[in-house]
Amino acid sequence: MADPKYADLPGIARNEPDVYETSDLPEDDQAEFDAEELSSTSVEHIIVNPNAAYDKFKDKRVGTKGLDFSDRIGKTKRTGYESGDYEMLGEGLGVKETPQQKYQRLLHEVQELTTEVEKIKTTVKESATEEKLTPVVLAKQLAALKQQLVASHLEKLLGPDAAINLADPDGALAKRLLLQLEATKSSKGSSGGKSTGGTPPDSSLVTYELHSRPEQDKFSQAAKVAELEKRLTELEATVRCDQDAQNPLSAGLQGACLMETVELLQAKVNALDLAVLDQVEARLQSVLGKVNEIAKHKASVEDADTQNKVHQLYETIQRWSPVASTLPELVQRLVTIKQLHEQAMQFGQLLTHLDTTQQMMASSLKDNTALLTQVQTTMRENLATVEGNFASIDARMKKLGK
């Protein structure tokens, strides 16, 4: 029954069923919905392998020493992660620098060193207690280093495309020369109809510098020799492979190298000379005659052995004939004896059981005899006691009668 204090409150519907929940889903079930699968071609689905990403960034640490990402206001500038104009490979990555990255790194380091030396020259005064490597000397050495770096002719040879083609300078140089030749041809073709004579100006001249690389030639020659040696080794390995025992041509071809195998083959070819073949044929004829004689002798020996075995088998059959006639009777007797033995075994078992029963009965009789003797003795004693009691009673009765 409802509490009466809520009976007269306004806004309470009377004579209507109570409703405790709405048609909406509960709050926990409202969050469950099926996400739409994006099937648009404009959306790029990127498949990320978490295991590969974990292996790539495993054991990697971000150095936060001396970094400050706070928004505090101060005189000093808050430094975050430093970034440069070029990509620098870290130490211990196991990745070899390309010529482009190496050139950019050296140029960048030389520029940084030049800036630092200029700052030192403007701030530090020369004195007698300076170190051996003074800023002035360091600036001179730095200028020489920069001159050597520029003297590599990389940007001069490859032009503005050095950052792109520095990984293959030879190919880039060839492409650059071809482009300049095409440009020269086109400029000559266009200016040929207008110029009437005289020497061309200096600006139309193209000067090429050819740099010979004997080390590269030696390296390519050594690579060709190594490739030839590799192919020769494979050929030798193929020639001296495992021999086939069934192939008579490959018998004896077990040379350690290609030259020895060729010499063995040459010896086999020389053995096929006509004079040598006649001698071999004569020897083969004599060997063939001996083989025929051995085959005949072997046939006669085999025939004698066969006759001996047949004679022994006939004698065995002759001895077996009388035994075969008596075999059915012998089998019948054996069956009868088997039955008799089974009956005798059963009779023996019965006798054993009877003997055991007789022994049990004898022991029971002995026990009963002993018990009977005890009962008789007890009865005699009891009878004597009863007789004595009756005698005493009679004596008392007689005394009472007097």
From Swiss-Prot:
Keywords of this entry: Acetylation, Coiled coil, Cytoplasm, Cytoskeleton, Dynein, Membrane, Microtubule, Phosphoprotein
Gene Ontology MF terms: identical protein binding; protein kinase binding; spectrin binding
Residue numbers of Phosphoserine PTMs: 83, 321
Residues bearing the modification N-acetylalanine: 2
GO biological process, one term: mitotic spindle organization
InterPro entries: Dynamitin
GO CC annotation terms, alphabetical: centrosome; cytoplasm; dynactin complex; dynein complex; growth cone; kinetochore; membrane; microtubule
Location relative to the cell: Cytoplasm, Cytoskeleton, Microtubule organizing center, Centrosome; Membrane; Cytoplasm, Cytoskeleton
Keyword Phosphoprotein: yes
Membrane topology: Peripheral membrane protein
One Pfam family in the UniProt entry: Dynamitin
Residue span of region Disordered: 1-24, 185-205
Modified residue annotations for Phosphotyrosine: 6, 86
First and last residue of the signal peptide: none
UniProt keyword annotation of Acetylation present: yes
Residues found modified as Phosphothreonine: 134, 199
Coiled-coil regions listed: 100-130, 215-247
UniProt record similarity statement: Belongs to the dynactin subunit 2 family.
Function: Part of the dynactin complex that activates the molecular motor dynein for ultra-processive transport along microtubules. In the dynactin soulder domain, binds the ACTR1A filament and acts as a molecular ruler to determine the length. Modulates cytoplasmic dynein binding to an organelle, and plays a role in prometaphase chromosome alignment and spindle organization during mitosis. Involved in anchoring microtubules to centrosomes. May play a role in synapse formation during brain development.
Subunit structure as annotated in this protein's UniProt entry: Subunit of dynactin, a multiprotein complex part of a tripartite complex with dynein and a adapter, such as BICDL1, BICD2 or HOOK3. The dynactin complex is built around ACTR1A/ACTB filament and consists of an actin-related filament composed of a shoulder domain, a pointed end and a barbed end. Its length is defined by its flexible shoulder domain. The soulder is composed of 2 DCTN1 subunits, 4 DCTN2 and 2 DCTN3. The 4 DCNT2 (via N-terminus) bind the ACTR1A filament and act as molecular rulers to determine the length.
Protein's name according to its UniProt entry: Dynactin subunit 2
Organism: Rattus norvegicus
Gene (UniProt): Dctn2
